């Protein structure tokens, strides 16, 4: 399960995923199956819903290691790859069309992975199970819509 700030409220949790509401925005989140090194924050993936910012399903990834300058981040859902934009420790979806395609792929796949290379050129792969993802996404979207 994910560690959440004290101000966050877990709306729903199932499988590897949880829907979280905090200060006017909602997220569907899961942590990487690979535990991070002791001195590193845990990698995670989140879909953000925030109507005030017109964000409906923005995909955000906290990488396991910082991205190499100018490097690429590939999110592969099932067998379908998506090129994300990234910088430092984070990567993001490229817009509403890609976000809709990612969510659709997540609903039909069993797992996904995020591939990148760090500053030393080492490959970084974070894997996620999608058990509970659709339910968490729907719960986060519904909670956000009620605000």
Task: Show where each model-derived region lies.
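Bacterial N-terminal signal peptides
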Residues: 1-3
């Amino acid at each position: 399960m994910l560690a959440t700030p004290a101000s966050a409220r877990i709306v729903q949790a199932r499988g590897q995923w949880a829907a979280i509401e905090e200060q006017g925005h909602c997220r569907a989140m899961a942590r990487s199956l690979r535990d991070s090194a002791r001195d590193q924050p845990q990698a995670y993936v989140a879909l953000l819903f925030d109507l005030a910012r017109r964000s409906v399903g923005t995909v955000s990834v906290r990488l396991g290691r910082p991205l190499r300058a100018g490097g690429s981040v590939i999110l592969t859902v099932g067998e379908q790859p998506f090129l994300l934009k990234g910088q430092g420790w984070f990567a993001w979806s490229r817009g509403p069309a890609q976000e809709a395609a990612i969510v659709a792929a997540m609903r039909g796949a069993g797992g996904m992975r995020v591939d990148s290379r760090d500053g030393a050129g080492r490959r970084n792969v974070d894997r996620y199970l999608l058990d509970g993802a659709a339910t968490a996404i729907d719960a986060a979207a519904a909670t956000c819509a009620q605000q």
